[in-house]
């Protein structure tokens, strides 16, 4: 049995299933240039990264962020369960940086990333950063009622310092790095030396870094950036995302970094999660 088939079988067999409120599909695509392997391109030097002093704001959060608005709800409890499973999947490896993605658009990846980040930030003295790495259809700033600039693309292109781009939400003990303006070559930017340097620096300042990234198919963004992070969660819409689409998405990834599948069913008025940390190759 192939590794991909093993992941799918275990997701069906071992994933715990819970019911909670539905996720809404994400917004319309801004544009999706064809995928291509990141070329080595000269990148402008980033401004020196100093001790972060993020802007503090009172964000107008989307009501679907149940981890903030309804922390005692069943829906919020499922995010806490997912947080626990991510921790148990570490197997002695430090999962400081985790990519959140999906096979296709509309699977609810951004909402999952936002709620999971809020839940992780609720842990005592846990420094959590949520990065909007979807430089094609950014959604994180909208969920938190923030401006998308300055942001990640500004920092990577040398147009802003990390201090300018980070946004602190003191009430939720969470820090956000918005997307910034949409670049013309997002895959190359995400695979750049500047991105690697930025993540190395952020790892020293945060306990968890969640990166919301574009869907895997048909884009190269995730596969290019995967070598810079510790793990990946794949968000799948139960009953909607075709199994071949999941297989195609997994086939282009380093499966040793796939922590598991999160099953999200938005079409029936409920959401279910199946997550199996045993999917991970040791």
Predicted feature descriptions by range:
Residues 1-282:
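P-loop NTP-binding module
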């Amino acid at each position: 049995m192939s590794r991909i088939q093993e992941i799918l079988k275990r997701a069906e067999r071992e994933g715990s299933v819970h019911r909670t409120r539905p996720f809404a599909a994400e917004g319309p695509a801004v544009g999706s240039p064809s995928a291509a392997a990141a070329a080595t391109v000269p990148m402008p030097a980033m401004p020196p990264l100093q001790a972060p002093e993020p802007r503090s704001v009172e964000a107008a959060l989307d009501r679907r962020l149940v981890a903030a608005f309804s922390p005692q709800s069943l829906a919020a409890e499922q995010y806490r369960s997912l947080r626990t499973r991510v921790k148990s999947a570490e197997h002695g490896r430090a999962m400081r940086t985790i990519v959140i993605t999906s096979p296709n658009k509309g699977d609810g990846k951004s909402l999952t990333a936002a709620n999971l980040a809020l839940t992780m930030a609720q842990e005592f003295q846990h420094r959590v950063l949520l990065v909007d790495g979807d430089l094609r259809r950014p959604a994180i700033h909208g969920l938190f009622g923030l401006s998308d600039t300055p942001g990640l693309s500004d920092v990577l292109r040398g147009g802003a310092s990390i201090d300018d781009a980070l946004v602190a939400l003191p009430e939720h003990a969470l820090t956000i790095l918005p997307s910034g303006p949409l670049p013309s070559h997002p895959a190359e930017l995400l695979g750049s030396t500047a991105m690697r340097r930025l993540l190395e620096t952020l790892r020293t300042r945060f306990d968890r870094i969640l990166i919301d990234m574009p869907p895997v198919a048909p884009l190269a963004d995730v596969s290019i950036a995967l070598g810079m992070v510790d793990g990946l969660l794949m968000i799948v819409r139960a009953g909607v995302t075709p199994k071949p689409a999941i297989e195609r998405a997994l086939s282009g990834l380093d499966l040793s970094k796939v922590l598991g599948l999160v099953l999200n069913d938005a079409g029936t008025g409920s959401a279910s999660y199946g997550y199996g940390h045993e999917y991970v190759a040791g």
